[in-house]
Amino acid sequence: MIKDVIKKSEEKMNKTINSLNSELATMKAGRANPTMLDRIQVEYYGSMCPLNQVANVSSPEPRLLVITPWEKPMLKEIEKAILKSDLGINPNNDGTIIRLLVPELTEETRKNLVKNVKKVGEQAKVAIRSIRKDANDKVKNFKKEGTITEDEMKKGEDDIQKVTDKFVKEIDTIVAAKEKEIMSI
């Protein structure tokens, strides 16, 4: 019973880590990375689609992204979506492809990015702690129902805390690595 609760909690915590990694991948660190564009939605025949479903995105140079739409009329829509996004990069449309030159990050921009990284990391920690609380509540309910003893409840809570600590430490490591990546010139 308790093992199932811990296993489900670990699965949820892993999803939180995956979500953190995905979100941090979209944060530009002065290098062009196609994942920077993952959150951009483009209007495609009346409905919104992710950019990577209407175009090929490549990074031929460290600071350059090239977007090649599968249909030429999509150039304007892609350009419009990039301009509306929070990327802060101006697209260069040459009629067949769109080039995005990722600017060098200024010291101030780097510091703001690091603040955002810390904020996202803190949100992930809050999510992990929320999962821990839910797991502890389930274990306490088992005790109330009389299906486990007081000692089993305490051991279960300790095990849940160990799992939580492991994931919080992993978040700290991921955030520190991203900060280092952003601050390195």
From Swiss-Prot:
Subcellular location per UniProt equals:
Cytoplasm
Which InterPro entries does the record match to this protein? Ribosome_recyc_fac, Ribosome_recyc_fac_dom, RRF_sf
**Chief localisation class:** cytoplasm
SUPFAM superfamilies hit by this protein: Ribosome recycling factor, RRF
Functional summary from the UniProt entry: Responsible for the release of ribosomes from messenger RNA at the termination of protein biosynthesis. May increase the efficiency of translation by recycling ribosomes from one round of translation to another.
Q: Which HAMAP family match?
A: RRF (MF_00040)
Q: What is this protein called?
A: Ribosome-recycling factor
| The species this protein was found in | Clostridium perfringens (strain 13 / Type A)
